[in-house]
């Protein structure tokens, strides 16, 4: 794999650090009044998910990580693995729960997810930024009941619980932002 110099560091770059692929979250070039310039880098280890800060001397090189990001459709979960399929080649890949993390709350069959592969093994699964999920359980919103915060908890078909407006009812499809876990709107009906 290619090597990257510290002057090529930018957010989103994937590098190898201590034998583990990492994603650069932030990069700051520091030029002290005395001495050599250095880069202060915030890194997330892709396998363990740990976030750490590391400094590199100016001009230092680091090996690039041989990771691949692919878009696959979620099929089903069998208890041990979550299965995804490439819609063009129909090749299937199973991901362990540790690769999914919080994403498991937003997986709906057929949705496209971004999967990061390292040596052919899924290490992270990211759901689309917005997903549409059915509401399976919520309290009825009573007319004129606006004394509270104007929201109520609702359980989605995936098991996740989000706050929704009072007018949303059981059986409706809602649009959720997976990055924040918040209600965005009712899902638009296909004509």
Curated annotation (Swiss-Prot):
Coiled coil: none annotated. One of its GO terms (cellular component) is cytoplasm. Keywords: Cytoplasm, Elongation factor, Hydroxylation, Protein biosynthesis. May be beta-lysylated on the epsilon-amino group of Lys-34 by the combined action of EpmA and EpmB, and then hydroxylated on the C5 position of the same residue by EpmC (if this protein is present). Lysylation is critical for the stimulatory effect of EF-P on peptide-bond formation. The lysylation moiety may extend toward the peptidyltransferase center and stabilize the terminal 3-CCA end of the tRNA. Hydroxylation of the C5 position on Lys-34 may allow additional potential stabilizing hydrogen-bond interactions with the P-tRNA. It is found in: Cytoplasm. SUPFAM superfamilies: Nucleic acid-binding proteins, Translation proteins SH3-like domain. GO terms for molecular function: translation elongation factor activity. Pathway: Protein biosynthesis; polypeptide chain elongation. GO terms for biological process: peptide biosynthetic process. Pfam families: EFP (PF01132), EFP_N (PF08207), Elong-fact-P_C (PF09285). The modification N6-(3,6-diaminohexanoyl)-5-hydroxylysine is found at residue 34. Its main location: cytoplasm. The keyword Transferase does not apply. InterPro entries: Elong-fact-P_C, NA-bd_OB-fold, Rib_uL2_dom2, Transl_elong_fac_P/YeiP, Transl_elong_KOW-like, Transl_elong_P/YeiP_cen, Transl_elong_P/YeiP_CS, Transl_elongation_fac_P. PANTHER family: ELONGATION FACTOR P, ELONGATION FACTOR P (EF-P) FAMILY PROTEIN. Belongs to the elongation factor P family. NCBIfam families: efp, PRK00529.1. Involved in peptide bond synthesis. Alleviates ribosome stalling that occurs when 3 or more consecutive Pro residues or the sequence PPG is present in a protein, possibly by augmenting the peptidyl transferase activity of the ribosome. Modification of Lys-34 is required for alleviation. This is Elongation factor P.
């Amino acid at each position: 794999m290619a090597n990257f110099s510290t002057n090529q560091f930018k957010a989103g770059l994937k590098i190898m650090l201590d034998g583990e692929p990492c994603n650069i979250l932030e990069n700051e070039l520091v030029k002290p009044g005395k001495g050599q310039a250095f880069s202060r880098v915030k890194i997330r280890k892709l396998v363990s998910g740990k976030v750490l800060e590391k400094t590199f001397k100016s001009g230092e090189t680091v090996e690039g990580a041989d990771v691949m990001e692919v878009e696959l459709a979620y099929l089903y979960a069998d208890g041990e693995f979550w299965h995804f399929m490439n819609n063009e080649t129909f090749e299937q890949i199973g991901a362990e729960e540790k690769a999914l993390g919080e994403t498991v709350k937003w997986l709906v069959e057929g949705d496209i997810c971004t999967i990061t592969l390292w040596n052919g093994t899924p290490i992270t699964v990211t759901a689309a930024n917005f997903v549409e999920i059915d509401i399976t359980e919520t309290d009825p919103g009573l007319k004129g009941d606006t004394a509270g915060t104007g929201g109520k908890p609702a359980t989605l078909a995936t098991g996740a619980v989000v706050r929704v407006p009072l007018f949303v009812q059981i059986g409706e499809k809602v649009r959720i932002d997976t990055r924040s876990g918040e209600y965005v709107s009712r899902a638009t009906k296909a004509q």
